[in-house]
């Protein structure tokens, strides 16, 4: 038996958030009660004061950089870091070297993930080599375990390719995740075209670059019925566009990075 005491117990599935004790017996949650109500009976006791007790967290957008860029991270170290942060399931992006656009590379990632203490899933790329010119074999890669499709970090500019990807993904019921920045509107990526641009005297990326592609792709997503994930959204206008689209379809989703929802350009 394991008794976890004095933690903040959070379970989004039932909207629970309260301080209390949690008893685990035979690998299952046996009881949740206010602090001090569960008596210690000889098992392991963990004092979780100041900590959160929650189901395993899921991160649908991670970079373990394996294969090809393991000087930054690899599947083993990434999984260990995820576990330390409470994440028990992760979805890897496909922008590795080689790109996860074929069965062999996808199998390498998934097999290596099986030897970690967490659940490791992986996306495949939407286009071959992340070039945005030719679709991967989505049906094959999905059948071999791809959790979704993304050219993360590179926007899909060819509308014909995008529509083909959406139609195919919708037919097999798998999500497509998109990096939304129109490069035609950007003079220097990674810096907002406002305070930071003026402060450092460099070009920047205007909010319109994100808004433009989000609006385009939401329209196509609603027409095709695809499950769409708008990646690392960073503007209030983008959020509002997603909110409006979700009123028409629950297949529309968005994600944000910690720095996008916790910092503004004034922090530069």
Regions found by a protein language model. Give the residues of each.
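Short, acidic/polar
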Residues: 71-79, 130-140, 216
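Histidine/acidic residue-rich metal-binding segments in metalloenzymes
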Residues: 134-268
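Acidic (Asp/Glu)-rich catalytic clusters
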Residues: 109-115, 138-143
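Active-site metal-binding motif and surrounding structural segment of the metallo-beta-lactamase
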Residues: 37-53
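Divalent metal-coordination and catalytic microenvironments
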Residues: 7, 22, 27, 50, ...
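Metal-associated gating/positioning segment near the N- to mid-region
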Residues: 51-113
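A glycine-rich helix N-cap at a beta->alpha junction
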Residues: 111-126
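N-terminal metal-binding scaffold of metallo-dependent hydrolase/deaminase domains
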Residues: 1-40
